[in-house]
């Protein structure tokens, strides 16, 4: 589940998944605006 994934990310990286990676990816940022990262 997403909850378990978030717990795993926190345990392995020490980062909170939604705040650290929420704007990462092809649809970056709120409202799917912004430039893609690592593209």
UniProtKB/Swiss-Prot annotation:
Q: Does the keyword Lipid metabolism apply?
A: yes
Q: How is its activity regulated?
A: Inhibited by ethylenediamine tetraacetic acid, ethyleneglycol (beta-aminoethyl) N,N,N',N'-tetraacetic acid, p-bromophenacyl bromide or N-bromosuccinimide, but not by iodoacetic acid or diisopropyl fluorophosphate.
In which tissues has expression of this protein been reported?
A: Expressed by the venom gland.
What's the cofactor?
Ca(2+)
Q: Name one GO cellular component term.
A: extracellular region
The keyword Amino-acid biosynthesis is annotated on this UniProt entry = no
Q: Classify the source by domain of life.
A: Eukaryota
Q: Which GO terms describe its molecular function?
A: phospholipase A2 activity; toxin activity
Q: Which reaction does it catalyse?
A: a 1,2-diacyl-sn-glycero-3-phosphocholine + H2O = a 1-acyl-sn-glycero-3-phosphocholine + a fatty acid + H(+)
EC number(s): the record gives: 3.1.1.4
Q: Name one GO biological process term.
A: arachidonate secretion
Assigned keywords, A-Z: Calcium, Hemostasis impairing toxin, Hydrolase, Lipid degradation, Lipid metabolism, Platelet aggregation inhibiting toxin, Secreted, Toxin
How the cofactor is bound: the record states: Binds 1 Ca(2+) ion.
Broad class of enzyme this protein falls into: hydrolase
Subcellular location per UniProt equals:
Secreted
Say which family it is in.
Belongs to the phospholipase A2 family. Group II subfamily.
Function field: Snake venom phospholipase A2 (PLA2) that inhibits ADP-induced platelet aggregation. PLA2 catalyzes the calcium-dependent hydrolysis of the 2-acyl groups in 3-sn-phosphoglycerides.
Q: What is this protein called?
A: Basic phospholipase A2 2
């Amino acid at each position: 589940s997403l909850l378990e994934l978030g717990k795993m990310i926190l345990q392995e990286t020490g980062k909170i998944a939604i705040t650290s990676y929420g704007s990462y990816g092809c649809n970056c940022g709120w409202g799917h605006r912004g430039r893609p990262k690592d593209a």
